[in-house]
């Protein structure tokens, strides 16, 4: 199938399903100079995002770049990269952060929408609570060692080799909310 045929099929599907489809976006959006630094099929990705989300029910931002801007948004940000939610402000945006994001979180969010016709409950960062509602610390297999006060002092000491808690060597599990400890 040619690119033109694929683009035409996408346009037909969006027209036939106005207000019923979701758009899944990967990557931050270049905005400087009208988005000219990121293009596909002769259009800027900025314009494509605006076009495909115009009649969408919701948008799912997949990955840390799409959800929060990621590394491309870091200073000096030569392309004016922003997260999807900076562009799409007129409909719900679900953020599934991670680099890479957890595949089950993506599939679970889409399946929830298809099954129930609505988006799942979201946390204060727009992430699905089902996948981002618990801290890694709460579900970590090293948690029993934390509770007993058994901490590795370096990554190559006896405690680390025995699976002790890594909190004292920089683990951010207690303040990181994600399902990666269980998936």
Feature-to-residue mapping (PLM):
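Iron-sulfur-associated redox domains of electron-transfer enzymes in respiratory
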Residues: 1-183
């Amino acid at each position: 199938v040619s690119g033109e045929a694929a683009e035409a099929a996408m346009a037909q599907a969006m027209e036939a399903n106005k207000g019923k489809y979701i758009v899944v976006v990967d990557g931050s959006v270049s905005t400087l100079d009208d988005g000219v630094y990121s293009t596909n099929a002769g259009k800027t990705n900025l314009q494509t995002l605006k076009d495909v989300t115009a009649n969408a029910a919701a948008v799912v931002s997949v990955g840390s770049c799409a959800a929060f801007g990621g590394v491309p948004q870091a200073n000096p940000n030569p392309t004016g990269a922003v997260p999807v939610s900076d562009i799409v402000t007129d409909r719900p945006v679900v953020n599934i952060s991670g680099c890479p994001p957890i595949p089950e979180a993506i599939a679970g969010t889409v399946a929830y929408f298809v099954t129930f016709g609505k988006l799942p409950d979201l946390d204060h960062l727009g992430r699905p609570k089902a996948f981002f509602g618990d801290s890694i610390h709460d579900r970590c297999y090293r948690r029993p060692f934390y509770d007993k006060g058994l901490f590795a002092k370096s990554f190559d000491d006896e405690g680390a080799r025995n699976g002790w808690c890594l909190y004292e060597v920089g683990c951010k599990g207690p303040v990181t909310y994600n399902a990666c400890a269980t998936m």
